[in-house]
Amino acid sequence: MSNTNNVWLAGFKLTSVNFYDIYPANSKKYDFPKYWKIFESREKTADPKLLEIKKMYKEDRLELSGAGRYFFKTEHLPDSLWVESSNTKLPPSSEYIFKVRSGGVVLTQACAQLLQQFRLGESTLTPVQIYDLETQQLCSEETFYFLNLCERREYLRDLESDGMLVSFMTDEKAVQYSVRGDIKSGQLLVDQSVQNCELDLWHDPLLMGHVFVSDALHDALVQVNMDSQWEMVSCQLV
């Protein structure tokens, strides 16, 4: 971390990170271009083998969605991204983070290369390119990176102190919190032991849908004008 040892709360919110109708797929495991309409229930089949493959595909997609929402490690990562046709809207070059189907978070190469200079632990960035399902050709030569952010650490303190967070019980009977409104700078309390954290990017399982960013990574993102989509606010160390 940098000399100020600050910590920043961030979230891949739809207010700053746009969703695009893009399918993540693993071409080594499924022939997605050939069978995607069956996988996505656009076409029916009575073929037992295809029905079994469709079932596995759905299970993998469900796990991928859970990994993005709850920040756990998954082996079912895509090696390609697919759009239905050349008319499908693609992210503009000004967006360095975007979301795809299954809740996947995808970064541009420039943003991914910056993150790779920092301590990500077991979190991974998998290279993918976008293809057209109609032509099975690349939509562009650009390489993107699919983020599997799976590192978890617990540093949050006094979560019920001022009513900004709402508690609820998860399916696993664990207490978790969601944000009520917007968190202001310095409002969220984080244990000062976070200064010894060996990571620059992690999720705290107590707080749903958010990640934490070290001062060093925050400063690097700001320096290259890649901070706005993260919507980072500083925390207060206690």
Which residue ranges define each predicted feature?
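Short glycine-rich, low-complexity/disordered patches
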Residues: 124-134, 227-238
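Short coil/turn motifs at helix boundaries and re-entrant loops, enriched in small/polar
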Residues: 108-109, 211-215, 221
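Aromatic/basic-lined ligand-recognition segments
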Residues: 137-201
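Aromatic- and glycine-enriched beta-alpha-beta binding-site module
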Residues: 82-154
